[in-house]
């Protein structure tokens, strides 16, 4: 996503990170950036109705950390498996909550993990699965 000054999100159970964009972005532009970075089949979101600059990210089901993201001064949280009530509550806090899909938000780390394991365990061949892929599809209502 091009975040700078990435750090642990307080209250994020050490699995959610936060950082800032080089410049504030309008929501449509940020959604496009998320789409290009993660390659989801679709994006669900609620609009916090403010420009996006400070962003929290949590791979997989980290929607429950939206309050921590808002308390940490974030404008948006990018994660997956967000519940409807979380969207409502995030919007009430002025936080843009983005559900980019479970697979896309976790799969993005796989190349980094492969390199880490290969470096950590010299001589170990690490192979990414060729069959593990996104299984969720979206039907576009005509």
Q: What is each residue range found by the language model?
A:
Residues 1-142:
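Hydrophobic structural segments
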């Amino acid at each position: 996503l091009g975040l700078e000054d990435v750090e642990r999100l307080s209250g994020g159970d050490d699995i959610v990170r936060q950082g800032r964009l080089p410049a504030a972005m309008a929501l449509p532009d940020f959604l496009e950036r998320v789409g290009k970075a993660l390659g989801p089949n679709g994006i669900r979101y609620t609009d916090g109705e403010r420009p996006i600059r400070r962003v929290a990210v949590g791979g997989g089901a980290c929607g429950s950390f939206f309050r921590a993201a808002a308390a940490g001064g974030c404008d948006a949280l990018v994660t997956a498996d967000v519940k409807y009530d979380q969207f409502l509550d995030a919007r009430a806090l002025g936080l843009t909550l983005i559900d980019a899909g479970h697979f896309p938000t976790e799969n993005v780390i796989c190349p980094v993990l492969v390199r880490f394991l290969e470096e950590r365990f010299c001589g170990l061949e690490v192979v990414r699965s060729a069959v593990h892929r996104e299984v969720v599809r979206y039907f576009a209502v005509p």
